[in-house]
Amino acid sequence: MKVIITVNYEEMSKKAAEIVKKQIKEKPNTVLGLATGSTPLGMYKHLIEMYKRGEIDFSNVITFNLDEYIGLSPDHPQSYHYFMFHNFFNHINIKKENVHIPNGIAEDLEEECRKYEEEIEKAGGIDLQILGIGINGHIGFNEPDESIETKTHVVTLTEKTINANKRFFKSAEEVPRKAITMGLGSIMKAKKIVLLASGKNKAEAIKETIKGQLTTKVPATVLALHPDVTIIIDKEAASLIPDEDLKEIEVIV
């Protein structure tokens, strides 16, 4: 596991974008696993700027998003489908048929999960998976106590996650109670993983992910079992990492 500490959110976002750019340069038909939420927004902004400067070509890139709320249509402003197109896909030259996001209004949700796994396999698996992390250590919508072998599945969101996401809605009551998410087993199949975190509210989850014991209570600790993980965090998210452990960490200021 490689850990990079940056001075702030902006530098974290820039570093993450550079890693994605390098991946696509090396493999133009890269399969990216993508995340939503406020954390990767800066990375998407930098990738759009790189595209506009002619530094990156998304025309052969394939993407799979981690998750989607159940019950929200793709055009709902709080759906992750809407988020991705509004904040990223509409601003680059990606082919719409190469974009994959779980369908939260599918008639048969179990079948939707099975098909999503099939599509990932058909694409050759995920080359580079981008992750955020919840304050309780969840990745995707894999909440505490999930099996580390799960594939794409339907989850019931915890009150903690609902409260964390209510800022995107008018009230907590409007936050969907269920979602489709790629499972921990699906995520761990990615060839490379980059996890992003920013802010003091993520510091405890980051400390546990980097130095804690492997436990389903903190889903992100499973990343210690993956052979190619890079964690990029700002100083605030790194604030609880013990000083003696900082010697092993790359710090970018």
UniProtKB/Swiss-Prot annotation:
Catalytic site positions: 67, 136, 138, 143
UniProt keyword RNA-binding present: no
Domain of life where this protein originates: Bacteria
EC annotation from Swiss-Prot or TrEMBL: 3.5.99.6
An example Gene Ontology CC term for this record: cytoplasm
UniProt-listed GO biological process terms: carbohydrate metabolic process; glucosamine catabolic process; N-acetylglucosamine catabolic process; N-acetylneuraminate catabolic process
Enzyme class: hydrolase
GO molecular function terms noted in the UniProt entry: glucosamine-6-phosphate deaminase activity; identical protein binding
Keywords (A to Z) from UniProt: Carbohydrate metabolism, Hydrolase
Pathway where this protein functions: Amino-sugar metabolism; N-acetylneuraminate degradation; D-fructose 6-phosphate from N-acetylneuraminate: step 5/5
CDD domains xref list: GlcN6P_deaminase (cd01399)
SUPFAM superfamilies, per the entry: NagB/RpiA/CoA transferase-like
A Pfam family per the record: Glucosamine_iso
Catalytic activity: alpha-D-glucosamine 6-phosphate + H2O = beta-D-fructose 6-phosphate + NH4(+)
Function as written in the Swiss-Prot or TrEMBL entry: Catalyzes the reversible isomerization-deamination of glucosamine 6-phosphate (GlcN6P) to form fructose 6-phosphate (Fru6P) and ammonium ion.
Family: Belongs to the glucosamine/galactosamine-6-phosphate isomerase family. NagB subfamily.
HAMAP family found in the cross-reference section: GlcN6P_deamin
Protein name: Glucosamine-6-phosphate deaminase
Organism of this sequence: Thermoanaerobacter pseudethanolicus (strain ATCC 33223 / 39E)
